[in-house]
């Protein structure tokens, strides 16, 4: 079973923050808009370790009681084809990081809700999950020298 995470949109940094949700929670972790986090999720995972979570490839900060650094993520299956989305998500996010125009944050939020959570939670495809780290996280490199590669295998 995949670990459950809540998303919170931080408009100041233009990133999605993920926080682990305790095993006692039920239902999808996105009951409302991405900006709304249930108050109980902030320290749901103990700071000591995250060995009970089944995700691999997450930085150590993912298991802190304060939650992980800013992460973006997508499922590998959706990344490997251009049929399922009008734009390539890495291209859109890369353009945003270097100041070029890209799709709105709303499009990215919808992409994540429709594609990632369906594959990750409902189908249990955490093996194919990849993690995108955007800025501010010192636990994992954002990209290699050139060409830029945002993704690390799960």
Swiss-Prot record:
A fraction may be phosphorylated in insect cells and HepG2 cells, a human hepatoblastoma cell line. Phosphorylated in vitro by host protein kinase C or mitogen-activated protein kinase. N-acetylated in insect cells. Its main location: host cell. GO terms for biological process: DNA-templated transcription; symbiont-mediated activation of host NF-kappaB cascade; symbiont-mediated arrest of host cell cycle during G2/M transition; viral genome replication. Disulfide bonds: none annotated. May form homodimer. May interact with host CEBPA, CFLAR, CREB1, DDB1, E4F1, HBXIP, HSPD1/HSP60, NFKBIA, POLR2E and SMAD4. Interacts with host SMC5-SMC6 complex and induces its degradation. Interacts with host TRPC4AP; leading to prevent ubiquitination of TRPC4AP. Interacts with host PLSCR1; this interaction promotes ubiquitination and degradation of HBx and impairs HBx-mediated cell proliferation. Multifunctional protein that plays a role in silencing host antiviral defenses and promoting viral transcription. Does not seem to be essential for HBV infection. May be directly involved in development of cirrhosis and liver cancer (hepatocellular carcinoma). Most of cytosolic activities involve modulation of cytosolic calcium. The effect on apoptosis is controversial depending on the cell types in which the studies have been conducted. May induce apoptosis by localizing in mitochondria and causing loss of mitochondrial membrane potential. Belongs to the orthohepadnavirus protein X family. This is Protein X. It comes from Hepatitis B virus genotype F2 (isolate Argentina/sa16/2000).
């Amino acid at each position: 079973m995949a670990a459950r995470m809540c998303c919170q949109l931080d408009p100041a940094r233009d990133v999605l923050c993920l926080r682990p949700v305790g095993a006692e929670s039920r239902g999808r972790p996105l009951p409302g808009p991405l900006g709304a986090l249930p108050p109980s999720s902030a320290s749901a995972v103990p700071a000591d370790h995250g060995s009970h979570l089944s995700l691999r490839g997450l930085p150590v900060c993912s298991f802190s009681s304060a939650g992980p650094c800013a992460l973006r993520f997508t499922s590998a299956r959706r990344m490997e084809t251009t049929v399922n989305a009008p734009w390539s998500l890495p291209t859109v996010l890369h353009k945003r990081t270097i100041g070029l125009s890209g799709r709105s944050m709303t499009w990215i939020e919808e992409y994540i809700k429709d594609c990632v959570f369906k594959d990750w939670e409902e189908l249990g495809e955490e093996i194919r999950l990849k993690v995108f780290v955007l800025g501010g996280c010192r636990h994992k490199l954002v990209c290699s020298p050139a060409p830029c590669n945002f993704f690390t295998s799960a």
